[in-house]
Regions:
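Helix-loop junctions at membrane interfaces in 12-TM secondary transporters
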Residues: 115-127, 316-330
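Structural signature of the two symmetry-related core transmembrane helices
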Residues: 97-112, 301-316
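A membrane-interface helix-boundary motif in multi-pass transporters
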Residues: 95-98, 180-196, 381-402
Length: 431
């Protein structure tokens, strides 16, 4: 689509004239968007019901169960390129509103289609991949709208805080809700996810205001090309990406743990959901603690101690033999693992090249997602095909994570030697 075309963009002029009202409207769209594209994911609210269906109805082993979610998330691994496409190719005259309305509607309809999909592995997987494709596009468009609005209103801090709060709330809601849905007919899960996704449609129609703006699609692609070249030569970013990959590439045992909870501890799905609730609450406490610590400690110190704590918490799964221990271990792991994730995401933000923040950060998150779901599949395969014990898998996971810790000291001093507050003062004091 060469040449200049008329497209819709965030109504920058009207936002600047009525900043409070515009920011409130934008916040409503972002809240609905983050809620819908987070909670209604097959890897979030529908994960426990789907895992339960695959294990107990289709009698899938751990490898097949983990593989299902790896391939189900295929679209999310390609999210950075969706951002380039939605920026360059307007849909019905705009880049945000139409993409959100179309993808949210199609995602909701796809969830409803899943209700009548035969309970066969490949057919279920195909529909879930379609669902995630539409949800990923909606998430990309909502994210682009948030950035656009934040730039126009100088409200990046407030909008980011809203986004983070909604995501954490989704994690807390997910545990008991997913546990309950897994205990009843799967159709209710699909209907609930479809309903949550469709909430985004009326909110977008009512509150997302756009006006026409001239955009040269060739310029967008040229800019994307420049960003890709810049990212490809960003040694600091790739060093950080290497550390993240090593941390996440440890053989995963999320699916193996699900089977252990049901087969050995004989937990119901509602009890499994309660354990997720404990982990989610402890994760929120970790986020609060990290927010305080990052202004007092430099990133190198945070990375080392957070990754060590995550490793220690991981070893707790060696003692996962009763409900009481499970509660304590899930809480400890929710706290420790969240701290490590926050430190690594902090590293990702700092190491992304200036001018390529969105694409660079998305690429690093995609690397994280690909490694996370891929290693869960790998870990499950080790148990099923090579008869590795669960405890051996836990030790292998912890050892691989521990290897990543010394590499923190090889990261460029520029990005790890400062505290969060020092970075802010340095940025604001630039001439």
């Amino acid at each position: 689509m060469a040449g200049s075309v008329m497209v819709d963009s965030a109504a920058v002029s009207s936002i600047q004239q009525r900043p409070r009202k515009a920011l409130a409207y934008a916040a409503l769209v972002i809240v609905a968007g983050v809620l819908a594209t987070t909670l209604a994911q097959s890897q979030v609210l529908a994960r426990l019901p789907l895992q339960n269906l695959l294990k107990n109805e289709l009698h899938a082993d751990r490898t097949a169960n983990a593989a299902f979610f790896f391939w189900a998330g295929l679209a999310w691994y390609l999210k950075p390129f969706a951002g380039i496409l939605t920026d360059a190719f307007p849909l019905f005259g705009n880049r945000r509103k139409s993409y959100i309305l179309m993808s949210a509607t199609l995602a909701a309809l796809s969830w409803l289609a899943l209700i009548v999909t035969p309970h066969e592995y490949r057919k279920l997987l195909f529909v879930v991949i379609v669902i995630n494709t539409f949800m990923m596009i909606a998430s990309t468009a909502v994210g682009g709208y948030m950035v656009e609005t934040a730039q126009a209103t100088s409200g990046s801090g407030r909008l980011t805080a809203i986004r983070q709060f909604i995501q954490q709330a989704c994690l807390v809601i997910n545990g008991p809700a997913a546990g309950y849905f897994a205990s009843i007919a799967f159709g209710w899960t699909a209907a609930a996810c479809g309903g949550i996704m469709f909430l985004l449609v009326p909110v977008t129609i009512l509150f997302l205001q756009e006006q026409r703006k001239r955009l040269d699609s060739r310029e967008v692609f040229d800019n994307a090309k420049r960003q890709l070249v810049k990212i490809g030569t960003a040694r600091t970013m790739w060093a950080a990406a290497g550390l993240m990959a090593l941390f996440y590439i440890a053989p995963g045992f999320a699916t193996a743990l699900f089977y252990k909870q049901q087969n050995e501890l004989h937990l119901s799905t509602q009890t499994q959901g309660f354990l997720q609730l404990i982990a989610g609450i402890c994760g929120i406490l970790a986020a609060v603690g990290y927010g305080i610590s990052c202004r007092r400690l430099n990133l190198r110190t945070l990375l080392v101690w957070c990754m060590l704590l995550a490793t220690a918490a991981n070893l707790g799964y060696l003692f996962y033999s009763s409900m009481g221990r499970a509660q304590a271990i899930e809480g400890l792991n929710g706290f420790g693992y969240t701290l490590a994730e926050l430190a690594l995401m902090d590293l990702a933000v700092r190491s992304t090249p200036a001018g390529s923040e969105g694409l660079g950060f998305s690429l690093m998150v995609s690397i994280r997602n690909l490694a996370l779901f891929g290693t869960d599949w790998f870990g499950s395969n080790l148990l099923d095909q090579y008869h590795l014990s669960f405890d051996s898998l836990v030790v292998a996971n912890s050892a691989t994570t521990l290897i990543a810790v010394p590499l923190v000291f090889l990261l460029p001093r520029l990005i790890v030697s400062r505290k969060d507050a020092e970075i802010y003062r340095t940025t604001t004091n630039r001439p």
